[in-house]
Design a protein with these regions (language model features):
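Carbohydrate-associated surface elements
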Residues: 132, 165
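A conserved mid-protein helix/loop that constitutes part of the nucleotide-sugar donor-binding site
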Residues: 1-6, 192-215, 232-238
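A short helix/loop element that forms part of the nucleotide-sugar donor recognition site in Leloir-type
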Residues: 142-150, 172-187
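N-terminal strand-loop element at the rim of the active site
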Residues: 2-52, 145-152, 232-233
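Aromatic "clamp/platform" in nucleotide-sugar-dependent glycosyltransferases that forms part
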Residues: 255, 274
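Short His-centered aromatic/hydrophobic patch
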Residues: 71-77, 95-96
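Conserved small/polar residues in nucleotide/adenosyl-binding loops
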Residues: 342-347
Length: 347
């Protein structure tokens, strides 16, 4: 939702207008923002049963006569793309933001493997947030540069890489936000704060993050870990923090809509994910000038500035050492650098 809304806020809505389709029970849809910008919203039944979902979506797409549909559901996009094809939507974009998961998510990986060819079959255009996400979904041939060897008819099937864009001004560092957030969360201004923002799930690997922070505390007692988000693993991670005896040094904020303020309060950003496409939180954190530690499962394209490192998911001690070395080394001009990098034409 966040990536799509970033584009929607910035786009010329007199030229292009969005309608949003989401599942019944979706929790993070910014309804008021969409209404204020002239967008319409349609609530869909869940995929189960799939025929009901397909009939409902096909009817709505037919009635509204869209020029373009843009799907962000990874391999599960095969169903809405099929509905769009049947409804006569001429341009159907499959936009991938992810790769495959770890061993704990074998059932999800199997589903992705089975659905992937059908998602590609029903799309007319391929998008991805990074080369890693593109290669996983579309294969090496689709991500290769265009050349005369390729059939001109198939050129539209090449992948368009669309990095997850953000409002750089919003995420620039603010001393005022830093003081305010620390006061709100009752964190001393002198503390070293390590931050993490993400859904609590196997992909984000928060269990390993807790192990990293235990090692950090052995060397720097005044450290605090802020973990922001919700998800199916949240209670499991809370229990792990309690079992480690560090609950007085860890702050769970729940879901927040002010990530820009949180980044200013952090001294270092940690993202030890098991897999990623191009994490927008990593872009935001670098824009705020933070030194960031990402796992090497994250695409190298996430290293936008010189303040991000990719580390293997090995020993928590290695991560702790790297985090302590870079904590507090903030680049307060990073927002301007990120803006320049994002807007500079490719060679």
């Amino acid at each position: 939702e966040q990536v799509v809304m970033n584009y929607y806020r910035a786009i010329d809505r007199e030229q292009v207008q969005f309608d949003f389709y989401f599942f019944k029970g979706s929790k993070f849809v910014p309804v008021e923002d969409i209404k204020a910008m002239g967008g319409r919203m349609f609530v869909l039944p869940t995929f189960r049963p799939p025929l009901k979902y397909l009939r409902t979506l096909r009817r709505l797409l037919s009635e509204n006569k869209y020029d373009i549909m843009h799907c962000h559901l990874s391999t599960l996009s095969f169903l809405p793309l099929l509905a769009g094809k049947q409804a006569g939507v001429r341009t159907r974009i499959l936009h991938n933001h992810s790769t495959s998961g770890g061993a704990r998510e074998w059932h999800r990986n199997l589903a992705k493997f089975l659905f992937k060819p059908f998602a590609k079959l029903h799309a007319t255009d391929y998008f991805a947030c990074s080369q890693l996400a593109a290669g996983w979904m579309y294969g090496s041939r689709a991500t290769a540069p265009l050349s005369e060897e390729y059939d001109p008819v198939q050129k539209h099937r090449r992948v368009r890489i669309m990095p997850n864009a953000i409002d750089t001004e919003k995420y620039s560092y603010s001393e005022k936000k830093r003081r305010e957030v620390r006061q709100e969360l009752k964190i001393p201004q002198s503390a070293t704060v390590f931050g993490h923002i993400g859904r609590f799930c196997p992909q984000k690997n928060q269990g390993f993050l807790v192990d990293i922070f235990r090692e950090i505390l052995k060397q720097r007692k005044n450290s605090v870990l802020i973990m922001t988000g919700t998800g199916e693993d949240m209670e499991l991670i809370k229990a792990r923090v309690i079992a480690a005896g560090i609950s007085d040094r860890v702050v769970f904020t729940g879901q927040r809509s002010d990530a820009d303020r949180l980044y200013s309060a952090f001294d270092c950003f940690l993202l030890p994910s098991n897999y990623e496409g191009l994490p927008v939180v990593g872009v935001e954190a670098q824009c705020s000038g933070l030194h960031c530690l990402f796992s090497n499962k994250v695409t190298p394209e996430a290293r936008i500035t010189g303040t991000a490192q990719l580390l293997p998911l090995g020993k928590p001690e290695d991560w702790a050492c790297a985090a302590l070395c870079c904590a507090g080394l903030r680049n307060k001009n990073a927002a301007a650098e990120v803006c320049l990098l994002y807007t500079s034409p490719s060679p």
